[in-house]
């Protein structure tokens, strides 16, 4: 993993040095009209896109196949007691880029509207995929950084809104070196978080970019901004995000990135969720909680219910990704692709 945390442990292999402060997309379309076969069996929906050269290329599948060796489960809740609208979006793709068992999972937490998070949900993975295809020899973490910056530059024009923004937590994992090793790449901007379970221990793979963080507060003030009650100019609580064009000189789109080798038998799952969960549940609490469940779907559902009981006041989106899948595991993920934005239609 690029970088380390105090509880990282000896299995965290440093692959590259970590810097914690470190064109026109086209809509994807589904290759198949239905995800059910004639006998009623649920099957993956293949998602494709046009690349910058006009070629049709695979993006991934909306559901796992019987051969998939990982499985994700989702739960989202508007938290209507405190919120009038749902501004979170997410995406989960199996066989990302047409490569068996590669995956892309992301959560986007919008603020001042859903437009920025919706744009990221529909486009960020495609921008990253094209960069990985076109520049296979470059560090993936560098490509993720460039992807965040590029997507950020397009949000205001695409949404006709310079106030909306979103935090982002992105995970891309794949097999490398002729499938002799598996690597998890992550990037986040803002306070959406990614936590890996390794031998039962919580390993945080993200950084909370908040006004309350001394490093981030210092960065903002050095750029001429004011921190008022841990908010940029008294307005925005996160210091890194996508969008927020009206604060573009102060709010950075450059993500915190990590690169972690996945060790079979040690790395069980990771949790990717917005701050609606993490505001009331610690990393280790979440890991301990999820380990009580075999199904990632049930784990995600129960974890969100737990956060609501702890009086979370925000929208909550939580995805639990089991890095190994036992034969016979059902696709009970709660993830669907009933529309081209792959979300908001689960129940």
Swiss-Prot record:
Obligatory cofactor(s): Mg(2+); Mn(2+)
Gene Ontology cellular component annotations, sorted alphabetically: cytoplasm; cytosol; nucleus
The protein's Enzyme Commission number: 3.1.3.16
Cofactor binding note from Swiss-Prot or TrEMBL: Binds 2 magnesium or manganese ions per subunit.
Matching SUPFAM superfamilies: PP2C-like
Record-annotated membrane-spanning stretches: none
GO BP terms: cellular response to osmotic stress; negative regulation of MAPK cascade; negative regulation of p38MAPK cascade; signal transduction
Residue segments, region Disordered: 1-41
Binding sites annotated in the UniProt record for Mn(2+) 1: 109-110
Oligomer status and interactors: Monomer.
Protein name stated in the entry: Protein phosphatase 2C homolog 1
Gene name, Swiss-Prot/TrEMBL: ptc1
